[in-house]
Amino acid sequence: VSGVYDPDPGSYIEFDGHDITNEPPHKIGALGLSRTFQLLRLYQDMSVINNVMSGYHTRVKYKFFDAVIGRKKIWDQEKEIKDEMMELLSFVGLADYAELNASELSGGQRRLLVLARAIAMKPKLLMLDEPAAGLSPVNVDNLMKIIMQLKDKYGLTLIIIEHILKVVMDTCNTVTVLDHGQKIAEGTPSQVKDDNAVIEAYLGKKMNDEEMRKALAV
């Protein structure tokens, strides 16, 4: 979807009625599709607030004459954007670090910053690639809380790719399970948990409630 890999010959990728197969990232973002990668890609030497503001660039509506004669209009718009981005940083718990460089954040904080930048694009669909990878149990719980609030606060549809079962089971309404690239189950978390194909592929056996609780723990 992001253009890193080409689709199979003869196929294409459609989002919200638009063919985005060969579109550049800024056009895909402007259509309302945002994503995070497992490998973090931040501007390490830029401040936290500027990293988040970089995600808003597709929404900025400067015109040529504004830059020439409308400086106050630009300044007012930039202040509005910065205020909105500070509210977003507060939402993910990073407001106190706004003026620090991204390189000064911990690994868990950087993941939250990447998430905030993706939200700043105001997407219709937000795709998260293993958002909990490498996080401590406390940070995983915090991330899950934020994900649950995202759906209500920003009206987002989310697609989450994640290997930590607890995150999947506690945050997703619908779960799709793949085994070696093939879909083997789809349904609610409770339906998928009891699916024989899923049990065989991922758990190896039928589990009682206590064993399942331990398996779902981080």
Indicate residue ranges for each PLM-predicted region.
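Conserved ABC ATPase signature
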Residues: 101-105
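Conserved catalytic motifs of ABC-family nucleotide-binding domains
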Residues: 122
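Conserved ABC transporter NBD signature motif
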Residues: 10-18, 31
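Conserved ABC ATPase "signature" region
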Residues: 64-97, 145-148
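Catalytic Walker B motif of ABC-type/P-loop ATPase nucleotide-binding domains
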Residues: 126-130
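A short, surface-exposed alpha-helical micro-motif characterized by mixed small hydrophobic
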Residues: 168-170
